Amino acid sequence: MSNSVKNIMIVGVGGQGTLLASKLLGYVLMQQGYDVKVSEVHGMSQRGGSVVTYVRFGDKVYSPVIDKGEADYILSFEKLEALRWLEYLKTGGQIITNTQEVDPMPVITGAMRYPDNIIEKLEAAGAKVDAKDFLSIAEEAGSAKAVNIVLMGRLSDYFKDIPYEVWDKAIDEIVPEKYRELNHKALKLGRG
């Protein structure tokens, strides 16, 4: 990967582990010698609301914020969140999304319907889309809560110049010991 500034958005809903994913990603990128800026926007995260984290890296990064049309990647823990943040993706950018559906409050209260054909809408907008049931893979690893690490494993496939061992070591450095075995398995299963 070149040393120009790259932008990754990690999006999901509260409780899905987006913040841990951003910490792991930041650690991995710093281990590769990049200047890394991470900015977290929580919204109503404790109530299942939208959560977004910006991760920017390169030789020198001056701002932690990603503007509309600048994201190289959107790592989405829930497909509606990928659609919600689509305008931030640059032309030809890559979306990696879990196909899981988490109903937002307006759907729960009956004020709106969950949108149909989200993956098709993302593709029609020109995004490259890698959509998969990452939740089932997390369950195979041992816990649905590991979906964040499964998605990190998938993201690692797009960064071939970063050795897998660096991603794996990030778990040892950041995740509490009692959860490490599960997370190592989830990371490995998430890879292509």
Regions flagged by a language model, labelled:
Residues M1-G192:
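Active-site cofactor/cluster-binding pocket
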